[in-house]
Amino acid sequence: MAVTPISLRPGVLAEAVVDLGAIDYNVRVLREHAGMAQLMVVLKADAYGHGATQVALAALAAGAAELGVATVDEALALRADGISAPVLAWLHPPGIDFGPALLADVQIAVSSVRQLDELLDAVRRTGRTATVTVKADTGLNRNGVVTDQYPAMLTALQRAVVEDAVRLRGLMSHLVYADQPDNPSNDVQGKRFAALLAQAHEQGLRFEVAHLSNSSATMSRPDLAYDLVRPGIAVYGLSPVPSRGDMGLIPAMTVKCAVAMVKSIRAGEGVSYGHDWIAQHDTNLALLPVGYADGVFRSLGGRLDVLINGKRRPGVGRICMDQFVVDLGPGPIDVAEGDEAILFGPGARGEPTAQDWADLLGTIHYEVVTSLRGRITRTYREAQTVDR
């Protein structure tokens, strides 16, 4: 991969730099895996912490056909920022007013007859036809219409189509074990999904598109691609199957801050609250001005490394709300105040990765990149040619 050095912007305490060139590259990789299927790029949770509007623009330019979000509010935010591409929202609280979504040409996925009724109420109030996808539960047991309620959903949709209240767009579901491509549950869900499509056809309903595959299935189960695939985490360059390595993707996010202070301490002195870490010899320290209020997990205290001037430096002592400390080692000081410290990034320069953090935390890299907040400013590198 061609690496362009990243430097801190003046006056910025800490940055999450999103490389739009990596987004472009990853979308093109996913398009290759998708074959004849179109791409719906998933932008929920502010594009997994990467910034929904900028990622949407980059993904659409790279060939994504549609966008997907969890909530209507997320879809409306894209519309407010001028994004006109098809966008689907699929997670709705009871009593939601779908009117603003219809007026903004947002497609709606419904998981129950009650949700469909609420949507049809908005159709009557606004005079707008709703573009509807049915979200079916094929085994995940989250949102999605359950099997025994599916016939009632189809009957209600038939009436709505006849009344021109609904344009029937799609059938979607979500896999339980997509990160385990060979798990037999994927085949079971695939068969259930195919049966639901057939059941709708028998009842005279034709979905324009069907989609089941998330990132991992897009890259490892071409037999489940159908008409559309819904990659999420892979768009951001994070492997949907970590046991298979990076899968040819480039992580888009680099988190960094400036060294706020450098100081020397004597052997026997402690660092941070409780002095959990005691210097075994004279050493030098660097203070980094980010903490658990910014998404640097407190449980990483004394466990994470950062990259400063080409070297991995271990964190020492407890991570505080606003700051933490790394050990520079004894002898001549090779770090100055204002130098760049990389908390995690693609790993190309030896820095830790989001997956490294996830491994330390016993979690997944999704949680790492979506937890950044507080005083970490998100900035962007414009899309450019990325070689790998």
Curated annotation (Swiss-Prot):
It comes from the Bacteria. Keywords: Isomerase, Pyridoxal phosphate. InterPro entries: Ala_racemase, Ala_racemase/Decarboxylase_C, Ala_racemase_C, Ala_racemase_N, Ala_racemase_pyridoxalP-BS, PLP-binding_barrel. CDD domains: PLPDE_III_AR (cd00430). GO terms for molecular function: alanine racemase activity; pyridoxal phosphate binding. GO terms for cellular component: cytosol. Pathway: Amino-acid biosynthesis; D-alanine biosynthesis; D-alanine from L-alanine: step 1/1. The modification N6-(pyridoxal phosphate)lysine is found at K44. Substrate binds at R142, M321. Its cofactor is pyridoxal 5'-phosphate. Its EC number is 5.1.1.1. It holds the Pfam family Ala_racemase_C. Belongs to the alanine racemase family. This is Alanine racemase. The gene is alr.
